[in-house]
């Protein structure tokens, strides 16, 4: 008769595992080969850093700095990570600001990418957004299809984002519908490539 407890999961006493064995890269010169369905977003892959301006009817306008990292691991999606920090009038950091994680995925027709894209975006403030959009050249435009919030999150009901690569820089504008307001400009920034 076995000494194993049938109610105990088999991994409970298993030895530790090594670190994650697969590479993720924001640099197309190293790491895994880019999945062919992502070729249309190749210019976005990298680490971007720059400045922007934000505001909303319920808050004062503010200046911020931001770093965006767009990477891949060889599969048919991109990983999007963003972190921002507020700046004072002399461009000195004041405090951390928005953070966001997400994934950009092409809509496929068989095994080929179309110009349609899906984006899943999540913030630590309890808001998750599902965006649907299209790529035109080096421009991506997304609009929310659904917004999910935790019970304690601020009321966000819709969003619209426009990204573009212009003269080698990453530019974006973001509109948000929240706390009783319709879609209203919220953030815009210009970031330059610092890695990748």
From Swiss-Prot:
Cofactor note: Binds 1 heme b group per subunit, that coordinates a highly solvent-exposed Fe(III) atom.
Protein origin, superkingdom: Bacteria
InterPro entries membership: Calycin, Nb(III)_bact/plant, Nitrobindin, THAP4-like_heme-bd
The UniProt record lists the keyword Transport: no
EC number of the protein: 5.99.-.-
Gene3D superfamilies per record: 2.40.128.20
Chain positions of motif GXWXGXG: 46-52
Catalytic reaction list: peroxynitrite = nitrate
UniProt enzyme class: isomerase
Domain comment, as recorded: Forms a 10-stranded antiparallel beta-barrel structure able to accommodate a hydrophobic ligand in its interior. In fact, this fold hosts the heme group, which is located in a wide surface cleft.
Protein name stated in the entry: Peroxynitrite isomerase
Organism of this sequence: Salinispora tropica (strain ATCC BAA-916 / DSM 44818 / JCM 13857 / NBRC 105044 / CNB-440)
């Amino acid at each position: 008769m076995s000494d194993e407890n049938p109610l105990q999961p088999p991994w409970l006493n298993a030895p530790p595992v090594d670190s994650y064995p697969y590479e993720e890269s924001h640099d197309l010169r190293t790491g895994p080969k880019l999945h062919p369905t992502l070729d249309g977003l190749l210019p976005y892959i990298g680490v971007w850093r720059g400045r922007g301006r934000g505001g909303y009817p319920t808050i004062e306008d503010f200046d911020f700095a931001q770093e965006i990292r767009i990477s891949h691991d060889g599969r048919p999606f991109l990983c999007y990570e963003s972190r921002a920090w507020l700046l004072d009038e002399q461009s000195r950091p004041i405090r951390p600001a928005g953070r966001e994680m997400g994934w950009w995925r092409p809509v496929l027709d068989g095994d080929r990418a179309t110009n349609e894209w899906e984006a899943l975006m999540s913030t630590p403030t309890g808001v998750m957004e599902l965006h649907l959009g299209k790529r035109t050249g080096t421009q991506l435009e997304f609009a929310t299809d659904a917004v999910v919030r935790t019970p304690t999150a601020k009321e966000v009901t819709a969003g619209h984002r426009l990204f573009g690569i212009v003269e080698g820089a990453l530019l974006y504008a973001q509109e948000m519908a929240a706390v009783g307001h319709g879609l209203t400009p919220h953030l815009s920034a210009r970031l330059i490539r610092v890695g990748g």
